[in-house]
């Protein structure tokens, strides 16, 4: 929507021998709840931040793609500590889904969904840019300075419209921006 901006960005390159990572959330849970307290489906679930993986090369099962557990963002909890290494972790009976794709594809997921990099099994590894977009009231993880905004001069020059400048963080700080 119009009320979001880039809150973080990173580049990832996992080698072909990547052993996989634990289940985790990049942010959240944003609406924490104890086990057994489910979300009331009559209320739209709020999205505070999303992650985007911009694939720089094809990413298939042998490359160790990101896996997500569908619906886990609605749990209000982190993945159970006793299962963070379990590749078959489920939530509400739903098994993990691999975010496979071709170079140039973008995989989007809610930042508080349980996800992990899977074990590479003979491919070339993962290679992607990761961008997190958050609601405007969520502070950017990379803070601008007087000298640099973590953007190249060319990128700053291309941000022409107010919306483009807001999206990449070229805006006056709000309360939570520090």
What are these regions (language model features)?
Residues 79-86, 106, 113-178:
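Non-heme Fe(II)/2-oxoglutarate
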Residues 25-37, 81-95, 125, 144-149:
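Short, surface-exposed loop/helix-turn segments at secondary-structure junctions
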Residues 14, 69-76, 132-138:
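Short edge-strand/loop segments of extracellular domains
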Residues 1-67:
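Conserved double-stranded beta-helix
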Residues 1, 57, 109, 134-136:
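Residue-level marker of positions within ordered structural domains that often coincide
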Residues 45-51, 57-116:
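Double-stranded beta-helix
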Residues 9, 14-15, 26, 33, ...:
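Surface-exposed loop/turn and secondary-structure junction residues enriched for glycine/proline
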